[in-house]
Amino acid sequence: MIFQASFYKSKKLLLIEDCEPVRASIKGMLQQIGFDDITAVADAMQAVSPAKRHSFDFILADFNLGDGKDALQLFNELSALGAIKTACCFVLMSTEPQRLPVFGVLQGTPDHFVLKPFSYVELEKRLAKAWQNRTALRKVYQAIKQTDLASALLELDEAIKAGSANALQALRLKGELLLAQGEYNAAAQLYSKIQQQRDFSWARLGAAVTMVKLQQWADAEQALLQLAEQDDIRPEAVEWLARCYLLQADLVKAQEQLTELLKLQPTHIAAHYALADVLQLNGQQEDSSRYLQKLIQQFRFSAFDAPECYLQLSRVLLEQAQHAELGAFTAALKKSSEALASMPQKLTTDVIEPELAVLRARISLLQGNVADAKQQLNLITVATKPVHVAAEQDKARLAFALGDTKQAEAHLAVLKSADFAADDLSGCCQRLLAKQAVLRETELRAQLRDLNQAGMDAVQKGNVKVALVKLRQAFLLMPCNAGLALNLLQVLSQLPAHKALLPLAKAVLSALENTSVTSANQQRLAQLLPQLPELYLD
């Protein structure tokens, strides 16, 4: 053994293995090595709680963890939660060779890999090697954790100059640190120098990423397309191609690369969300709706189940309902409500609940419950920065629909000034969605004026049915605009009573009842009410 049993006796280890007999066997090996403090769990979901509670020195995880997240996804989740301490060694094990990420060591990657079956001697060698590597660069990792990148670079330069066994890892870290600091030219020079000595895949990818950062789009595309032909680096290259195209707003090519990425990594959740966003950005609402429904069915009640799918599906269905014909409106609106209701209770966190409440209020308003929607609007605060573009747009839409254009503009101002600096898939999509949201809200106001004008022109020409279609569309965009509501009420008073029009008439009357109206509008309402069919006034 490389280390004595006494070394391991003081260390805490988390073992994650879904097969009970294998888990027991590996635990026995670990005890033979010298570990006393061993926490053994069966899957990724069971691992999160102890990882958050305890400060483990080692995490030993099987790559394939049944139906839930694999070990790499668990590693990313625990890293995001801050549940992996700086000195912790994360070691993967599998019956088949697994490709570890070649880029992203700055954000963190597993320390080592051990191929099953193994003896306790082989396992100890891997654990010891991981510990030695992590310890040798502990000052670097500590500085990175404290976001002291300048100190981290100094420590890396020392390790590289010393020519230690960890010099290669130090070079990888240095390249990514330079990129993180915005030192793109320095990073390009470093990767070029490394490639002159040896053709490492990670260095070639680092050079291509540097081209993306420098917005050298043609060179970046060519380099990434070449890397995408290499098996050992294909997923990372394809993902960076998708990012490259998203940064240029080339949605067609981005969609192609995201589709290819998901063939390579079917549980790449960020890629799934990005593809759904791209479909929305492309105006493919039906495709976006179907894709979100597919994701919900595929991952429901699994470790990948997430509230974003339910929220976004509800938004897409709500927009479809607003454009539905009169006869299909109620059923379409019900689908939006059902999408929210289908979200498992465990996903309704304190962060998600405000988003849910705003969406429910938007749906409730279109059902004619103006007072409830206004009550929710009073609880909304304008964020200093958006947590999520769609959530901020929901607030703007609700405020606008209720006639509070000042608050609506405040939410749009947040989107206009938002700085989505991250160039990961989510950050790229959020940046594009924010631009589209601001543009669409501006178009919405122009559309509202056009619909109202077209409706009143149709009234003057005696084409009441056309007027109904136009003014109803305008009303659904802004129910609490007294002028619009009165125009629609005028049309309803000129049409024969019909049960199909009853919900619309009730919604218009409810909106007028809960909206401030001028004295002139009050007089107009008083004139119109006697002209309405009794069916609508019961």
Spell out what each predicted region is.
Residues 9-21, 26-30:
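Conserved acidic segment of CheY-like receiver
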Residues 35-43, 50:
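Short hydrophobic/Thr-rich beta-strand motif most characteristic of the beta2 strand and flanking loop
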Residues 60-80, 86, 494, 501:
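Conserved phosphotransfer microenvironments
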Residues 72-73, 86, 96-112:
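Alpha4 helix (beta4-alpha4-beta5 surface) of REC/receiver domains from two-component response regulators
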Residues 118-127:
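C-terminal output helix
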Residues 131-183:
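CheY-like receiver
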Residues 185-410, 424-432, 443-463, 491-495:
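Flexible loop/N-cap segments at domain edges
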